[in-house]
Regions:
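N-terminal accessory segments
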Residues: 1-7, 12, 228-237, 255
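Pre-Walker A-like glycine/lysine-rich segment at the N-terminus of P-loop NTPase domains
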Residues: 2-66
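Short polybasic amphipathic segments
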Residues: 5, 101-103, 123-130, 246-256
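Glycine-centered tight beta-turn/hairpin loop motif at sheet-sheet or coil-to-beta transitions
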Residues: 12, 107-111, 257-259
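Conserved ABC ATPase signature
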Residues: 46-50, 244-281
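Long, charged, glycine-rich C-terminal linkers/tails
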Residues: 83-86, 236-248
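Electropositive, glycine-dotted interaction segments
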Residues: 113-241
Length: 281
């Protein structure tokens, strides 16, 4: 669950900017949108971002995608390193400084604070801390500067042997998520970050969001999805996915007046239906 997302010197955001999902104490109107972990703070399940034209809404969406994509691709040996491809600092400066991201998430009774600082050449800094939600105690998982990685006691024995193998352009989180380790901390944080979803108002034009999340929903929660589609009167009787041709395709089933079944490509459904499915995800 997302608690905070911070970015600095990315796209149009020169100064540190924070998206905070902590609910204010006076928030009483929609208690079903609150998550209560038994702590002093409660957290929003969903937040909507409004603003004037050119105020940064689309760039916030892009920044989240860059943050996630660097984590996904920083170990891949492509033609262009991920940090170079997604290093897009504030433009109106003669000398570009490092870009920075940080996220706080809660999973399995722990709050994790993870972030990294980077430029087009290397990872300048990276860190991961874990706070026990029951005791309030915070411990270091790892801290990285441009030349060294220091591990906390909980992972040091298992991870120390790999520290010299981590390339300067690769994130520690990405590196250890790829390995089969006894500790689950890297996989837990990686999964929570990948589950963070920022939906733009023109989301119907972005098939990547559906292709990434909808197959798992169809496989694991199809019954709930169909109940939801019935409740909003979408007219959809079934939904399926197929990637046999190396391209994810979604098909919806409708019942005609003649009681025959008719099949429709999901992207031929109305914008409202597609947006509703994305909100369900």
């Amino acid at each position: 669950m997302l608690v905070q997302f911070m970015l600095k010197n990315v796209l149009s955001f020169k100064e540190e900017t924070v998206l905070d999902m902590t609910a204010v104490q006076a928030y009483k109107e929609h208690e079903s949108n609150l998550i209560d972990y038994g702590t002093k703070e409660k957290f929003l399940r969903v937040a909507a971002i409004y603003g004037a034209n050119a105020s940064g809404k689309s760039n916030l969406y892009l920044a989240v995608r860059y943050f996630q994509q660097i984590i996904i691709d920083s170990l891949n040996s492509g033609m262009v390193p991920a940090i170079k491809e997604y290093y897009i600092p504030f433009s109106f400066e003669e000398h570009h400084e490092n870009s920075e991201f940080e996220i706080s998430v809660i999973t399995e009774d722990f709050e994790y604070r993870y972030g990294y600082e980077y430029n087009a050449e290397y990872i300048a800094a990276e860190w991961l801390y874990r706070k026990n939600m029951n005791t309030g105690r915070t411990s270091t998982i790892f801290e990285r500067t441009s030349g060294t990685v220091e591990f906390g006691a909980s992972v040091r024995k298992e991870c120390e042997v790999y520290k010299e193998q981590i390339p300067s352009e690769t994130l520690v989180l990405t590196f250890f998520n790829k390995l089969k380790l006894e500790t689950t901390v890297f996989r837990s944080v990686y999964s929570e970050i990948m589950n963070m979803l920022v939906v733009p108002t023109d989301l119907c034009e972005d098939r990547g969001i559906l292709e990434r999340f909808l197959p798992d929903v169809i496989d694991l929660e199809k019954g709930k999805l169909m109940e939801f589609l019935t409740a909003i009167d979408a007219g959809i009787k079934d939904i399926s996915c197929d990637d046999r041709d190396k391209r994810m395709e979604f098909t919806t089933t409708h019942m005609g007046k003649d009681k025959n079944r008719y099949f429709l490509d999901l992207y031929s459904e109305s914008e409202g239906t597609i947006k509703s499915i994305l909100l369900f995800i």
